[in-house]
Regions:
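Active-site-proximal cap/loop segments of hydrolase catalytic domains
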Residues: 526-734
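Structured, non-catalytic alpha/beta "coupling" segments that mediate domain-domain communication
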Residues: 131, 136-146, 325-326, 336, ...
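C-terminal substrate/ligand-recognition segments
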Residues: 332, 369-372, 376-380, 465-471, ...
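N-terminal chloroplast transit peptides
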Residues: 1-47
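Glycine-rich His-Gly loop
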Residues: 330, 426, 494-499, 576, ...
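Beta-propeller folds
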Residues: 2-14, 58-391, 395, 504, ...
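Secondary-structure transition/capping motifs at alpha-helix termini
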Residues: 155-157, 196-197, 211, 298-301, ...
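Cap/lid segment of the alpha/beta-hydrolase catalytic domain
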Residues: 169-178, 440-441, 448-571, 575-576, ...
């Protein structure tokens, strides 16, 4: 079911602020695995942030021409004007930049050492495996170093590889390849390119052949699919919204026309093809409700047909097999995801029949359809499982995955008739391992492509903390098996708790570095996230947001009670919308932590939700509520909003990384938060006047490059090094 299904299951709405605060669209990134991934000590949920590609083994050369009249748009995007008074913004920005220049020197030497260690770990645990490939018939397409190559055999070497596309030669020097789609007859290739400093992508359509030619350039494209040999459907993104679907043809009489428009500002439109390429699906999703339209790929010019009209609170997603629609949906009780089916000719929900229902408190992480099977990736009590449904024998086989695994990455399977499903398992401190499930053999096989060094000095513990209302909240803890006196070791606590998204539990070299140096890592799976299913999210959004805060407090207190560190050695890490709970705890219980590190944090909920002119505010109402229409909601948001609850008290030290180009969380709000927090901390210190009174460090590191989800490898590595240097100074020098 590829990337769209994963996004769908992990929160569904592509317009929500994990797609507004956090752009967590799970795309098939067709770039070399040699490419360093973005470092994050701050695990915002599920994020696959893109970064630039380092030099590869195959070098590009000039090879194609642009069709006459085809213009390549400039990607040097101008930043939108600031809505707050320009002078105030400039003064605040200049003040924080000056402050950073004055204090950054104290972290420079340590950050340099940390950066070197992370690079060494990256070399040790990252292997030169081949790029993900698209197989179409006898042809193999793959991407490396910003270029797309074609090979007619599986044996890829410079002798039998032909270059089709180079981002650099097209003038996209700072862009990376985001997605590739090949037309069924392989005459055309559509590729999207995205800059690190911009949310918008550009789609370049090339006519293949002996001498590839740029046929069309489409700016501001979000998703696109070939419906037939010469008909491309795509969605247009404007101001972070995606509500229009267009069809463009590459026949003799070329034309482009609008096919679908979404009128409701709460909904975001995305398209993809079913696995068997029988239908193109037009998916209009809010954060709680779905509506899907089908375009028959055999008749691409016919109007889309509605599957089921949107019903409040019902989320659904469509796949196809043998003239039946397979529907992944929250319809029915309990309101968790379940697999249902219906005939194509009568697709209304009155005809939906149950195929498979999840057990209680089980999270559906992903689903992949094949011709005769369906694989469900499940999570229960912190453990990962495979459930394999056979459409032939009507049986279900359940396989428990290795206990160390905390996350998985499903590899793309362009051929739905394949007999093997490939995926990778990982954890924050375990490098990815490749596995294969064989439908023929009914077994799981570990693919030892290259020996991965075994991590033997890390112990994993799964705990349950009792929250204020008696709800049990999962915690995943990692620590060095050789560590003694854990109550004296530094503890880094991670939290998110929004949009039904899980904490990111994939491998990060910097996490392993901390474990090797004796740190404890804790991941608090609080309500508002999705770790325990759809209801876990509902129980932590809108008027239930404070439950997530109660959960976080209970988790940290349990960790300390069990001897995992103590407050003066404890730090809290969060990013984007995770900043709400982290910032709220910093106000309500600052005594529980010594330091806090935030990345692109959402910390002014009330002011943001009061400004409907912002592009994403209306979409956010299903997560946070509508304070303009509901005074009770306004008071509730104000009760936990990090910015509005700052007061003179003894705060922990705080390090915030923010981006000038962040279109999702404007820098002005972060600047105001830092100024207010620093003033409150200084006011408290001035009032108490105790001997040796501790004054926290409140630091804002503003990045001119990068955006909310995208930074180069070098920039992100430097960011992480500075964050770790700050944490070490705060926790190890106590």
């Amino acid at each position: 079911m590829c990337w769209t299904a994963k996004s769908f299951i992990r929160g569904l709405s592509y317009s929500v602020k994990y797609c507004s605060k956090d752009n967590h669209l799970q795309k098939i990134h067709l770039y070399s695995k040699l490419k360093p991934k973005k470092c994050h000590i701050l695990d915002w949920s599920g994020s696959t942030c893109n970064s630039t590609v380092p030099p590869g083994s195959i070098l590009p050369w000039r090879f194609f021409s642009c069709k006459e009249g085809t213009e390549i748009p400039c990607k040097r995007k101008k930043i939108a004007s600031i809505t707050t008074p320009e002078l105030l913004y400039k003064d605040l920005l200049k003040s924080e930049q000056k402050n950073w220049n004055e204090i950054s020197g104290r972290y420079k030497a340590m950050a340099k050492r940390i950066k070197k260690k992370i690079e060494e770990l990256h070399k040790k645990y990252t292997f030169s495996s081949e790029s993900p490939r698209i197989k179409v018939g006898e042809s193999v397409y793959f991407e490396e170093n910003g270029c797309i190559f074609l090979s007619k055999t599986d044996d890829v070497d410079e002798g039998n590889v032909r270059i089709l596309f180079s981002a650099e030669d097209l003038g996209f020097d700072d862009a990376f390849i985001q997605r590739i789609r090949i037309s069924p007859d392989q005459r055309y290739m559509a590729t999207s390119l995205k800059s690190e400093n911009s949310e918008e992508a550009t789609c370049v359509v090339m006519k293949l052949g002996g001498f590839p030619v740029v046929e069309k350039v489409i700016p501001n494209v979000f998703s696109f699919e070939w419906v037939s040999n010469d008909v491309l459907y795509y969605t247009s993104q404007k101001n972070l919204k995606c509500q229009d679907v267009f069809m463009t043809t590459f026949t003799k009489q070329k034309h482009t026309e609008l096919v679908y428009t979404e009128q409701d500002a709460r909904f975001f439109v995305d398209i993809y093809c079913t696995k068997d390429r029988r239908f193109l699906t037009i998916n209009s999703n809010s954060k709680t409700t779905s509506e899907v339209w089908l375009v028959d790929c055999r008749h691409p010019f016919k109007s889309p047909v509605l599957v089921q009209a949107r019903t409040k609170g019902v989320i659904y997603h469509i796949e196809h097999r043998n003239d039946e629609l397979y529907i992944l949906t929250t319809y029915g009780e309990p309101a968790e995801y379940k697999l249902m089916k219906a005939p194509v000719s009568s697709s209304g929900m009155e005809n939906w029949q149950l195929v498979y229902a999840l057990e209680e408190k089980t999270k559906l992480v992903d689903l992949e359809m094949f011709s005769d099977h369906c694989i469900l990736f499940l999570q229960n009590a912190g453990h990962l499982y495979l459930n394999v449904i056979s459409f032939v024998s009507h049986s279900v086989q359940s396989i428990k995955l290795p206990a160390w695994a905390c996350a998985f990455e499903l590899e793309s399977h362009p051929e739905h008739t394949t007999s093997t499903c490939y995926f990778q398992l990982t954890s924050p401190v375990h490098p990815p391992k490749r596995f294969a499930y064989s439908f023929k053999e009914n077994n799981l096989i570990e693919q030892a492509v290259q020996e991965v060094p075994i991590i033997t000095n890390c112990h994993t513990t799964r705990l349950l903390a009792k929250s204020k209302d008696e709800t049990l909240v999962p915690i995943t803890v990692f620590h060095n098996t050789n560590s003694k006196e854990l109550h004296r070791k530094p503890l880094l606590v991670h939290v998110y708790g929004a949009y039904g998204m899980d904490l990111n539990m994939s491998f990060k070299e910097e996490k392993l570095l901390l474990i090797e140096e004796g740190w404890i890592l804790a991941y608090c799976h609080v309500r508002g996230g999705g770790e325990l299913g759809h209801s876990w999210h509902k129980d932590g959004c809108q008027h239930n947001k404070l439950k997530g805060l109660d959960d976080l407090k209970a988790c940290i207190m349990l960790l300390h009670e069990l001897g995992f560190s103590q407050p003066k050695y404890t730090a809290l890490a969060a990013a984007s919308a995770g900043g709400v709970l982290a910032g709220a705890l910093c106000n309500s219980n600052p005594e529980l932590i010594r330091a806090m590190v935030l990345q692109a944090p959402f910390i002014d909920v009330l002011n943001t939700m009061m400004k409907t002119h912002l592009p994403l505010t209306i979409e956010e109402q299903e997560e946070w509520g509508n304070p303009l229409a509901d005074e009770k909601c306004m008071k509730y948001i104000k009760s936990y909003c990090p910015y509005h609850n700052i007061k003179p008290q003894c705060y922990p030290s705080v390090f915030i990384t923010a981006y000038e180009n962040d279109q999702r969380i404007p820098l002005t709000g972060v600047l105001r938060y830092v100024q207010k927090l620093r003033k409150a901390a200084l006011d408290h210190a001035g009032r108490t006047k105790k001997k040796g009174n501790w004054i926290p460090n409140i630091i804002l590191d503003i990045q001119a490059n990068g955006s909310h989800c995208d930074s180069s490898w070098e920039d992100s590595l430097s960011e992480v090094a500075r964050q770790l240097a700050f944490l070490k100074k705060e926790l190890e020098d106590v």
